[in-house]
Amino acid sequence: MQKDIHLKMEPLKITCSTCFTSFDIVSSRKTIAIDICSKCHPFYTGDRTLAKATGQIDKFQKRLQKKQK
């Protein structure tokens, strides 16, 4: 078996940037940044309010209707 080829595992604290919940894990990385976690994600919390994202075609149709009026 070769020595010193394995990654060094260290304790790491991950903090969600949305709800500021922190998780303690063991990882070979120095830092991990997450935007959303299971504590604040709508799928896990049961929040079913979905914001409809307006697409490029919808934006174009609105501009076209304004110009025609």
Curated annotation (Swiss-Prot):
PROSITE patterns recorded: RIBOSOMAL_L31 (PS01143)
Keywords, in A-Z order: Ribonucleoprotein, Ribosomal protein, RNA-binding, rRNA-binding
GO biological process, one term: translation
Classification via InterPro entries: Ribosomal_bL28/bL31-like_sf, Ribosomal_bL31, Ribosomal_bL31_A, Ribosomal_bL31_sf
Residue intervals passing through the bilayer: none
Domain of life, per lineage: Bacteria
Gene Ontology CC: ribonucleoprotein complex; ribosome
An example Gene Ontology molecular-function term: rRNA binding
Self-association and partners: Part of the 50S ribosomal subunit.
Function, as annotated: Binds the 23S rRNA.
Membership in a protein family: Belongs to the bacterial ribosomal protein bL31 family. Type A subfamily.
Protein's recorded name: Large ribosomal subunit protein bL31
Species annotation: Mycoplasmopsis pulmonis (strain UAB CTIP) (Mycoplasma pulmonis)
